[in-house]
């Protein structure tokens, strides 16, 4: 089926001008998930150093700050199509006992890029050099546990899926056998379906899509989550094989681009060739338009804005002791005995509690929206002030130039 991807990629290339393309992808995963190695493998060169922040069993630290690191790489394929790939790495994600700040940092970054577009669209004269920083795709790396999603995985996709195209990826899939990998994929997709998590599943319009694209998208859906293998090493194999990027084992060298054992090549082609424009269009026409409509109408920008304050998420185990009410899919209720002993009072208390929780949730939603709109208004005012200062400075420079020219003209006349 990989031939379908190649044919579809060639067809889509002919539909677009051969000019520079800018594409932004965010790589999210816990330390040890292979983010840095995957970035280097994706770009075919050393872009970032491998992470050294893997926590040891004896490490007693509970808080590690998330960092957003941006790298820009220019790629060019065999047909001369240039892609400016903006990569956002997320070292420190999921390495704390309380990971809610990490969610907020990533969410705020994505929202800020939308706000910048919204601000640019509101200007009378737009900046021709304005750079669109919107994140077109988020690759979420899942550790190969052989099980389904952990709580942190569920919460991240639940909270960020309405803002960015999330594609789930099983990293370091060579650590699993074929049967284990097949089971791992099945369990992950069952969790995604069970909790109705919003991921990018290569959507399409049945009335407009061609038969070839339909077959391609359906094939890509069967591969979710993609299973990848990365490597920072390049080996010279000799003969017709030439140079490969692979991983060395006692029994030989594994080619990470071998589609029979890894989905890496298919994922790379989907990201950078066949579905690059689809991801960009979906970001602009669906995700951004939804954000824009809700922001201007004063409604909730995303589904998570109506949730109570985030509680602590365990970044290392799905058996977390988190006490979030009605939002933890992995925690069973422990109030069964109380319900049996005193059902009437419990129902009354539950009703009152739910009403209070709904009221507080609504108040929190309104407060968050007011803060966001206030910050947006302040940013607009600041932009206007800076533009006004630039205009005044420009007028001053023009007056000085005019005065100098007049002075030079008078000197020439006197001579």
UniProtKB/Swiss-Prot annotation:
The keyword Repressor does not apply. Residues 307-360 are annotated as: Disordered. GO terms for cellular component: ascospore wall; cell division site; cellular bud neck; cellular bud neck septin ring; cytoplasmic microtubule; cytosol; Gin4 complex; mating projection base. Sumoylated during mitosis on the mother cell side of the bud neck. Sumoylation probably plays a central role in regulating septin ring disassembly during the cell cycle. Changing residue 230 to E: Temperature-sensitive; no effect at 23 degrees Celsius but loss of function at 37 degrees Celsius. Residues 329-340, 348-359 have a biased composition (Polar residues). Residues 354-414 form a coiled coil. It holds the Pfam family Septin. GTP binds at residues 29-36, 92, 172-180, 230, 247. One of its GO terms (molecular function) is structural constituent of cytoskeleton. The modification N-acetylserine is found at residue 2. A motif (Basic motif) lies at residues 12-19. There is a cross-link at residue 412 (Glycyl lysine isopeptide (Lys-Gly) (interchain with G-Cter in SUMO)). Residues 29-36 are annotated as: G1 motif. Changing residue 29 to A: Abolishes GTP-binding; no strong effect in vivo. GO terms for biological process: actomyosin contractile ring assembly; cellular bud neck septin ring organization; cytoskeleton-dependent cytokinesis; division septum assembly; mitotic cytokinesis; protein localization to bud neck; septin ring assembly; septum digestion after cytokinesis. The modification Phosphoserine is found at residues 2, 305. Residues 19-298 form the Septin-type G domain. The modification Phosphothreonine is found at residue 327. Component of the septin complex which consists of CDC3, CDC10, CDC11, CDC12 and probably SHS1 and rearranges to a cortical collar of highly ordered filaments at the mother-bud-neck. A complex formed by CDC3, CDC10, CDC11 and CDC12 is capable of forming long filaments in vitro and the components seem to be present in a 2:2:2:2 arrangement in vivo. The filaments are proposed to be formed by the end-to-end polymerization of CDC3-CDC12-CDC11 complexes with CDC10 serving as a bridge to bundle the polymers into paired filaments. The coiled coil domain is required for the interaction with CDC3 and BEM4, but not for interaction with CDC12 or with itself. Septins are GTPases involved in cytokinesis that assemble early in the cell cycle as a patch at the incipient bud site and form a ring approximate 15 minutes before bud emergence, which transforms into an hour-glass shaped collar of cortical filaments that spans both sides of the mother-bud neck. This collar persists until just before cytokinesis, when it splits into two rings that occupy opposite sides of the neck. The septins at the bud neck serve as a structural scaffold that recruits different components involved in diverse processes at specific stages during the cell cycle. Belongs to the TRAFAC class TrmE-Era-EngA-EngB-Septin-like GTPase superfamily. Septin GTPase family. This is Cell division control protein 11. It comes from Saccharomyces cerevisiae (strain ATCC 204508 / S288c). The gene is CDC11.
